[in-house]
């Protein structure tokens, strides 16, 4: 009887291992790469993800006839550079290995990150009058929004929570007002699709958004970081917002960054120029 129980347990374990192995073998993408995204125009942009070690990944787009290839390394990571045309779309990207992923409704245009503290975070769901008044007019199919969920980490992460959505009254009302109105202005002025990435957190000091190695190698910045107070309602430890909310974005090609910062660094004004 004991032998039968042992055999059953071994079989169950083998089943779990097989399922787990198959799951890791599948081609996967970080959340920043998905349907409805905007890719930076006229650039070599990186696409990346995970797959079984040594697996060959093929990438095809509908804006040209090139087939791009990448091979997953021993860490199960793959990466490829693809060429993007001038602004336009929508397009489809097909990524295939053991399984196939089809990214639909992809636009090519200008990509901006909206980061910093409270003035950048402010949105319609925080009773901002301008956003509330604008919301009924926010059906903007050429503006795409990616809202990064607030989180912290002790070490740089390779993925984050969030997904690309088409700008609508429902999605815009939760998004950075500064980011939205900036994107709307670009879109209307130069007739170019705009992708906006919302990664901000009210009250946070600049050191929270700065990589640890940058702080450690500069004695003035390090002194300012060590003088920061601790608060229950927002993070203030060095690098922890960067690790969770910015590090996973660093491979994604952008046009620029909208940044609001200052109030939480008043006490360490002497390091602000270096920051």
Residue spans for each PLM region:
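Bacterial Sec-dependent N-terminal signal peptides
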Residues: 1-28
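Cell-envelope and extracellular/periplasmic
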Residues: 24-275
């Amino acid at each position: 009887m004991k032998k039968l129980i042992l055999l059953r347990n071994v079989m169950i374990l083998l089943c779990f291992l097989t399922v787990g192995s198959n799951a890791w073998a599948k081609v996967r993408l970080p959340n920043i790469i998905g349907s409805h995204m905007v890719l930076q125009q006229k650039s070599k942009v990186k696409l990346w993800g995970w797959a079984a070690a040594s697996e060959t990944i093929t990438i095809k787009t509908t804006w040209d006839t090139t087939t791009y290839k990448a091979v997953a390394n021993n860490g199960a990571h793959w990466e490829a550079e693809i060429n993007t045309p001038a602004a336009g779309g929508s397009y489809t990207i097909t990524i295939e290995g053991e399984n196939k992923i089809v990214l639909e409704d992809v636009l090519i245009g200008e990509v901006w990150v909206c980061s910093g503290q409270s003035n950048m975070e402010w949105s319609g769901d925080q009773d901002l009058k301008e956003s509330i008044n604008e919301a009924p007019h926010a059906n903007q199919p050429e503006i795409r929004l990616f809202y990064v969920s607030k989180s912290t980490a002790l070490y740089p992460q390779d993925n984050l929570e969030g997904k690309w959505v088409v700008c609508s009254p429902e999605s815009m009302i939760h998004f950075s007002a500064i980011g939205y109105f900036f994107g709307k202005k670009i879109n209307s002025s130069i007739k170019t699709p705009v992708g906006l990435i919302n990664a901000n957190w009210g009250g946070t000091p600049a050191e929270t958004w700065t990589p640890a190695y940058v702080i450690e190698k500069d004695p003035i910045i390090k002194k300012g970081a060590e003088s920061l107070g601790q608060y229950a309602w927002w993070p203030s430890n060095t690098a922890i917002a960067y690790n969770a909310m910015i590090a996973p974005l660093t491979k994604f090609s952008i046009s620029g960054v909208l940044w609001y910062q200052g109030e939480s660094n008043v006490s360490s004004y002497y390091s602000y120029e270096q920051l």
